[in-house]
C-alpha cells in the first residue's frame, strides 16, 4: 500500500514545470523519464513490478524490490536516460583506435608453435636468384641444392639441405620459381616482380615450413596467368597442385616489413595446403578466386616491432579455411569479397575437426556482395574477445555472422549494416545467426538490418546478455509473398536472459520474439513500429524494461 500511495502522490505532484521523472534504484543508479509523456504509474497484482506508462505508448517497467523511490525534477537538471531513436554508422576512429595482442616468440622447440618463428631459424647457406627479362640466374654451388632452368626464366630448385635461405629479386614478365625441398627454408623477396602467364609465379612443392620474408623497404609483385598449363606429374603419378599465384604444400609464415602485391587471374591469390600465418608486412591481393585459401588455419598477429596490413579484393572468398580456425589478434584486414569475407567451414565427417573463428584484436573492415554470403561464416564457434569490426553485406540472405555453433562476444566492437532481403530460397538476411547459444559478456554490438524480413539476432539456442552495449535496428516491412511471410524482427530466439548491459531493439514486427525473456538487471528498450514490442512471456527481477508498442 505504501508503494501505491507513493506512486500516486508522485504522479499527482508532477506540475507543468516538471520535466524529468527519476526512478532511483537501490544500486544507486537511476533512469530519467520525460514527464510530459507520463500517463500513469501502475503496479502488477503482486506488487512486484512498477510500470511508468507514457502517452506515446512507452512502458518503463521495474522490479519494485530494486526501486528506492520515484521523484520528479522541476529544473530539468539531467538528460533523459533513453531515446527511442538510434543510428548505426561506421566510426572512422575504429580504424586507428583498436587493441592488438603482441605475440610472444616461443623458443621451446618441444612446442609446435616454435616452428612458426623465423627468429628460431638460422640460415647457414644463402642462395641468390636473380630474375630479368632475359633470363634467371642462381648462384647455388652446393650439391644438395640443385636447379634447372627452362625457357630462360622458369627455374626449379631441388634441395635436401637444411637452414637454407633464398634471396629472390629482379623483374620478369614470363618466369616462375618452383621449389622442392625436404627441409624447411626461407624465401626473402627483395624488389621482386614476377609474372607467370601459364601458372603460379611461385610454386612450393614442399610440405615443410616456408618463412616468407618481405624485405625492408621493398615492393614485391607476383602475378599468374588466366589459363594454367597442364600440371607436372609427380613420381607417384598424381598431378602436382598449382592452385594460385603463390602456392605452397606446407605452412606459409609471412614476416618482414616490406610489401607484397599479388594478382591472380586464374586461381587463388595465396594458397597453402597447410596453414598461413601473417606476422607482419603489407599484403595486397586481387584474385579471381579466393584471396587466401588454406587447408588448415589462417592466423594474423603482430611482432613486437610491426603489425600486418592486409587488403583483399576477391571474386570468391576473402579468406577460406578448409578445416582450420581463423585467428586474428592484430593488424588491419580489409576485404571486398564476392563470396564469404572470412570462412572457416569444415564439411567433412571427422568429429575431431572443428573450424572456429576467434577475433582478439586488430581492425577488420569487410564487404560481401553475393547472395547468402557473410562477413564471418563458421561451421564451429565464433568468438570476439577484442578488436573492431566493420561489416557491410549487400546480398539477399546474407549475414554479418553465420555460425553453426555458438557466438560469444566478450569484448571489442562490431558494427554491421545489412542491405539484403530474402534470398531466392527464402533465406532471411540478418545480423547474427547461430545454431547454438549466443552469449554477450561485454563489448559493443551495433546492427542495422535494412531488408524486408531481416532478423537482427536469430538464435536457435539460449541467448544470455551479461553486459555490453547493444543496438539492433530492423525496421523494414515484413517480407510478404503469396506462399510465405517473413517477419522483420530485431531479436528472435528461445529463452533470453538479460543480466546486465544495455539492449536497444527496434523493429517493424516484434522487437523481441522468443520462448521467454528474463530481465535480472541492465536496461532493455524494445520498440515496434507495427506490432507489440515484446512477444514472449516476461519475467523481471530487476533492471529496466522499456517497451513501446505500435500506435
Map each language-model feature to its residues.
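Sec-dependent N-terminal signal peptides
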Residues: 4-13
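Sec/Tat signal peptide C-region and signal peptidase I cleavage site
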Residues: 14-18
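Extracytoplasmic low-complexity repetitive segments enriched in small/polar residues
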Residues: 19, 33-34, 48-50, 60-67
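Short polybasic amphipathic segments
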Residues: 19-23, 48-52, 77-81
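Short N-terminal segments immediately surrounding and downstream of signal-peptide cleavage
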Residues: 20-38, 54
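Structured surface patches comprising rigid loops and adjacent beta-strands/short helices at the edges
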Residues: 35-43, 63-72, 91-98
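Mid-chain, structured segments of secreted extracytoplasmic proteins
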Residues: 55-79
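A composition-driven surface/loop motif
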Residues: 82-83, 96-551
Amino acid at each position: 500500500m505504501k508503494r501505491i500511495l507513493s506512486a500516486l502522490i508522485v504522479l499527482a505532484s508532477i506540475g507543468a514545470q516538471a520535466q524529468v521523472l527519476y526512478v532511483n534504484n537501490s544500486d544507486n543508479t537511476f533512469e530519467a523519464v520525460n514527464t510530459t509523456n507520463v500517463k500513469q504509474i501502475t503496479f502488477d497484482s503482486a506488487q512486484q513490478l512498477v510500470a511508468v506508462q507514457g502517452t506515446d505508448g512507452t512502458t518503463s517497467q521495474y522490479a519494485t524490490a530494486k526501486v528506492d523511490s520515484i521523484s520528479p525534477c522541476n529544473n530539468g537538471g539531467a538528460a533523459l536516460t533513453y531515446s527511442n531513436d538510434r543510428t548505426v554508422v561506421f566510426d572512422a576512429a575504429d580504424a586507428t583506435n583498436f587493441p592488438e595482442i603482441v605475440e610472444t616468440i616461443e623458443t621451446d622447440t618441444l612446442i609446435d608453435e616454435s616452428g612458426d618463428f623465423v627468429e628460431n631459424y638460422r640460415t647457414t647457406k644463402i642462395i641468390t636468384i636473380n630474375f630479368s627479362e632475359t633470363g634467371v640466374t642462381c648462384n647455388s654451388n652446393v650439391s644438395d641444392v640443385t636447379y634447372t632452368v627452362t625457357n630462360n626464366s622458369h627455374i626449379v630448385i631441388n634441395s635436401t639441405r637444411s637452414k637454407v635461405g633464398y634471396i629472390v629479386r629482379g623483374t620478369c614478365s614470363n618466369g616462375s620459381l618452383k621449389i622442392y625441398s625436404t627441409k624447411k627454408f626461407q624465401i626473402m623477396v627483395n624488389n621482386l616482380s614476377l609474372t607467370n602467364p601459364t601458372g603460379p609465379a611461385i610454386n612450393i612443392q614442399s610440405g615443410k615450413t616456408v618463412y616468407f620474408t618481405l624485405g625492408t623497404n621493398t615492393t614485391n609483385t607476383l602475378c599468374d596467368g588466366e589459363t594454367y598449363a597442364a600440371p607436372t606429374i609427380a613420381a607417384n603419378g598424381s598431378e602436382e597442385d598449382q592452385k594460385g599465384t603463390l602456392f605452397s604444400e606446407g605452412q606459409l609464415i609471412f614476416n618482414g616489413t616490406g610489401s607484397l602485391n599479388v594478382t591472380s587471374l586464374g586461381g587463388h591469390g595465396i594458397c597453402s595446403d597447410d596453414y598461413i600465418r601473417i606476422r607482419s608486412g603489407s599484403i595486397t591481393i586481387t584474385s579471381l578466386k579466393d584471396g587466401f585459401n588454406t587447408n588448415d588455419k589462417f592466423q594474423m598477429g603482430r611482432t613486437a616491432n610491426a603489425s600486418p596490413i592486409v587488403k583483399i579484393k576477391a571474386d570468391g572468398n576473402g579468406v577460406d579455411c578448409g578445416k582450420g580456425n581463423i585467428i586474428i589478434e592484430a593488424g588491419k584486414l580489409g576485404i571486398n569479397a564476392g563470396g564469404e569475407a572470412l570462412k572457416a567451414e569444415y564439411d567433412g565427417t571427422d568429429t575431431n575437426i572443428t573450424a572456429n573463428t576467434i577475433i582478439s584484436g586488430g581492425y577488420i573492415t569487410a564487404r560481401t556482395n553475393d547472395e547468402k554470403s557473410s562477413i564471418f561464416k563458421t561451421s564451429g564457434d565464433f568468438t570476439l574477445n577484442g578488436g573492431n569490426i566493420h561489416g557491410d553485406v549487400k546480398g539477399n540472405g546474407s549475414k554479418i555472422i553465420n555460425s553453426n555453433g555458438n557466438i560469444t562476444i566478450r569484448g571489442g566492437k562490431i558494427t554491421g549494416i545489412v542491405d539484403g532481403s530474402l534470398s531466392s530460397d527464402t533465406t532471411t538476411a540478418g545480423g547474427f545467426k547461430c545454431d547454438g547459444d549466443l552469449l554477450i559478456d561485454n563489448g559493443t554490438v551495433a546492427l542495422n538490418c535494412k531488408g524486408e524480413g531481416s532478423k537482427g539476432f536469430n538464435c536457435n539456442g539460449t541467448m544470455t546478455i551479461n553486459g555490453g552495449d547493444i543496438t539492433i535496428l530492423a525496421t523494414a516491412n515484413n517480407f510478404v509473398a503469396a506462399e510465405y511471410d517473413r517477419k522483420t524482427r530485431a531479436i528472435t530466439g528461445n529463452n533470453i536472459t538479460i543480466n546486465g548491459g544495455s539492449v536497444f531493439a527496434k523493429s517493424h514486427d516484434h522487437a523481441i520474439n522468443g520462448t521467454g525473456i528474463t530481465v535480472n538487471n541492465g536496461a532493455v528498450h524494445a520498440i515496434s513500429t507495427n506490432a507489440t514490442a515484446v512477444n514472449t512471456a516476461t519475467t523481471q527481477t530487476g533492471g529496466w524494461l522499456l517497451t513501446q508498442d505500435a500506435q
